[in-house]
Amino acid sequence: MASQSQGIQQLLQAEKRAAEKVADARKRKARRLKQAKEEAQMEVELYRREREQEFQSKQQAAMGSQGNLSAEVEQATRRQVQGMQSSQQRNRERVLAQLLGMVCDVRPQVHPNYRIAV
């Protein structure tokens, strides 16, 4: 009986060691997967930064020529607005006088289509 008990104990210990090895293997696998995921994430982030930097440089090159153009358009717009404002200041009094003259100087007239009923 003692040999059977000893054999069972050996089997239980072997099963326990096997379970520990399987658990260790699972932990190592989980660590490797986590490390691979982190490395992949870092690589993706590095690639994204490179592409973003490349995009920024191309955009800067394209906008450099447009930057001068937009500055010229901005300056032309300012000149036109200043011209309109000065024209408004010059003609303001004359236009107000015309408007007030049309509103205040009413000349009563009979409408040409009006027929006098007899």
UniProtKB/Swiss-Prot annotation:
GO-annotated biological processes: synaptic vesicle lumen acidification
Q: Which Gene3D superfamilies match?
A: 1.20.5.2950
Cell compartments where the protein resides? Apical cell membrane
Query: Main localization of the protein?
Result: membrane
| Superkingdom of origin | Eukaryota
Q: Which UniProt keywords apply?
A: Acetylation, Cell membrane, Hydrogen ion transport, Ion transport, Membrane, Transport
Subunit structure, per the record?
Answer: V-ATPase is a heteromultimeric enzyme made up of two complexes: the ATP-hydrolytic V1 complex and the proton translocation V0 complex. The V1 complex consists of three catalytic AB heterodimers that form a heterohexamer, three peripheral stalks each consisting of EG heterodimers, one central rotor including subunits D and F, and the regulatory subunits C and H. The proton translocation complex V0 consists of the proton transport subunit a, a ring of proteolipid subunits c9c'', rotary subunit d, subunits e and f, and the accessory subunits ATP6AP1/Ac45 and ATP6AP2/PRR.
Record's NCBIfam families?
Answer: V_ATP_synt_G (TIGR01147)
For this protein, the record's PANTHER family field holds: V-TYPE PROTON ATPASE SUBUNIT G 2 (PTHR12713:SF13), VACUOLAR ATP SYNTHASE SUBUNIT G (PTHR12713)
Q: Please state which protein family the record places this protein in.
A: Belongs to the V-ATPase G subunit family.
Put simply, this protein is called V-type proton ATPase subunit G 1
Gene expressing this chain = ATP6V1G1
